[in-house]
Amino acid sequence: MKLCDFEVGLDQPFFLIAGTCVVESEQMTIDTAGRLKEICAKLNVPFIYKSSYDKANRSSGKSFRGLGMDEGLRILGEVKRQLGLPVLTDVHSIDEIEQVASVVDVLQTPAFLCRQTDFIHACARSGKPVNIKKGQFLAPHDMKNVIDKARDAAREAGLSEDRFMACERGVSFGYNNLVSDMRSLAIMRETNAPVVFDATHSVQLPGGQGTSSGGQREFVPVLARAAVATGVAGLFMETHPNPAEAKSDGPNAVPLHRMGALLETLVTLDQAVKRNPLLENDFN
């Protein structure tokens, strides 16, 4: 699959979707994107910057949601203009899609909306690549139906069906907890869509702090290594210059100063894994 200006798939090095959870300010966004660009260029990692203009799904109605759609999109547009980076952001309603698609390179659907047929259809008809997040409540094999919905809508609109990714971000395990089943990454390959692993939301503790979500960022490297060892097309990781002061999802964000070391390890592992065919393909 061609994504932005690079190829993605199990026969290609993993690509990275990374950035702050939410757009907090223009300067921090540009600085963070610039630093990530430097790191990824050094390691030859294809890179898409991500950040949200609005956090529609918050634990508390008093939580910071963002700078607003117009300002958030303007800042993401500056990332493209100043740094020459492709940009991804999530959309939350059908009404937002046209305006968002006019600015960003890749759309993302929130996990909680993966079963909303009209919403998935509308995203698919945008003409943009779409990273479709698997709901925390969904079995991995059920993602085939979700991807098929997107492909059907794209085909009916006369658009390419080869623009959709399936993203794993953990599954609910009791209250305020998520677990990652690495088998899901292999199962989701059966969609014939590139599989992306969200290593930071997978360590989230949803609502675990009462009015906000907690997280266990110390396990991000553990799960990221496991996903790369399993074999994925891409990784999704949120980061922040100072996670303790992040306005959203700080507890599961990778400290920006640690991203280089983490990615260096993951690149080495990815190269080793993709040097040979995946053994599970011959086990049935």
From Swiss-Prot:
Record has Repeat as a keyword: no
Example GO molecular function: 3-deoxy-8-phosphooctulonate synthase activity
Catalytic activity line of the entry: D-arabinose 5-phosphate + phosphoenolpyruvate + H2O = 3-deoxy-alpha-D-manno-2-octulosonate-8-phosphate + phosphate
Major location category of this protein: cytoplasm
EC numbers for this chain: 2.5.1.55
Enzyme type, top EC level: transferase
UniProt superkingdom: Bacteria
Pfam families found in the cross-reference section: DAHP_synth_1
Pathway noted in the entry: Carbohydrate biosynthesis; 3-deoxy-D-manno-octulosonate biosynthesis; 3-deoxy-D-manno-octulosonate from D-ribulose 5-phosphate: step 2/3; Bacterial outer membrane biogenesis; lipopolysaccharide biosynthesis
GO biological process, one term: keto-3-deoxy-D-manno-octulosonic acid biosynthetic process
CC annotations in GO: cytoplasm
Location relative to the cell: Cytoplasm
Bridged cysteine pairs (disulfide): none
Keyword Phosphoprotein: no
Keywords, in A-Z order: Cytoplasm, Lipopolysaccharide biosynthesis, Transferase
Family statement: Belongs to the KdsA family.
The protein's name in its UniProt record: 2-dehydro-3-deoxyphosphooctonate aldolase
Gene assigned in the entry: kdsA
